[in-house]
Amino acid sequence: MITEKIDNISVTTKANVYFDGKCVSHGITFTDGTKKSVGVILPATLTFNTGAPEIMECVAGACEYRLAGSDSWVKSAAGEKFSVPGNAKFDIRVAEGFEAYHYICHFG
């Protein structure tokens, strides 16, 4: 199931812009204090570092990801999720000529 709408949240209006604009996200906070981010990654290959564990939920487009210590790229498309451990690195790539990867990042 794809998350299409999120109700009852507070949105940080200033965007987080990474990698010269190849990744742009906004922080959201739920009434219970839970924090997530929603964003988009344009065609590129990027490396991220995590603090807390993350679940990346694809809501549109697709990407390939590679967790630290792995040589394999794994595809993630709309409606799919993948988990990244805390205090880890992972690579994510969106192929040129394809739709941007739209995501919700669930922390913790």
From Swiss-Prot:
CDD domains: cupin_PpnP-like (cd20296). One of its GO terms (molecular function) is purine-nucleoside phosphorylase activity. GO terms for cellular component: cytosol. Keywords: Glycosyltransferase, Transferase. The keyword Glycoprotein does not apply. Its EC number is 2.4.2.1, 2.4.2.2. It catalyses: a purine D-ribonucleoside + phosphate = a purine nucleobase + alpha-D-ribose 1-phosphate; adenosine + phosphate = alpha-D-ribose 1-phosphate + adenine; cytidine + phosphate = cytosine + alpha-D-ribose 1-phosphate; guanosine + phosphate = alpha-D-ribose 1-phosphate + guanine. Pfam families: Ppnp. Gene3D superfamilies: Jelly Rolls. Catalyzes the phosphorolysis of diverse nucleosides, yielding D-ribose 1-phosphate and the respective free bases. Can use uridine, adenosine, guanosine, cytidine, thymidine, inosine and xanthosine as substrates. Also catalyzes the reverse reactions. Belongs to the nucleoside phosphorylase PpnP family. This is Pyrimidine/purine nucleoside phosphorylase. The gene is ppnP.
